[in-house]
Amino acid sequence: MLNKPAKPQAAAPATPNASMSMSTDARASMRVTEKAIYKYYNDMGKNKGNCTWGAGILAHKGVCSSEELGRLVNAQSVDIVFGQKVAEAERIVRRSIKVDLNQAQFDALCSLTYNAGPTGASDTFLLINRSDFVGAAANINRMIKVSIVKNGKKTKVVARGLIKRRAEESAPFRAQPVAASALSK
């Protein structure tokens, strides 16, 4: 019985953004937006939103317990986990997006994914993969509401801080490239 050589397996198609990472400027800007708070806190104020710490790092959905609200974190922990979360957002964007992005678009999607998570960003990813950048921009701009529990009922409210952030994240998808033929006129 002869051993047959193994059939070569087709290489997985490379994603068009496989070598991209968040720019230094965008990462620094996001670090300013995600202000470091060196303790656990509720991201929408007293008894509202989700239990969060550091640079907008989700501890868990729902408000912090009184024990958690007393928990302090140090700058090193914030920096380490922020870096891990940014790297995770970059991997998600690289894996999820099948069309070419420019650096500003990649940066914006990393920021969106860091903040909204892969599930929150998934509709935007679908629109971008259909090359519907205008639709993606509109979708990002609508992502300004968060769930809170009020009088025992879950309700959505506008998070004022997200309005500016979503405008910045959607901007690279609103900008339409000028066709080369238009430049030569």
Please give the residue ranges for each predicted region.
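Amphipathic alpha-helical segments that form the core helices of the histone-fold
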Residues: W53-G54, C110-Y114, L126-L127
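Short alpha-helical scaffolding segments that buttress acidic/His motifs in well-ordered protein cores
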Residues: M30, Q105-T113, N139-I140
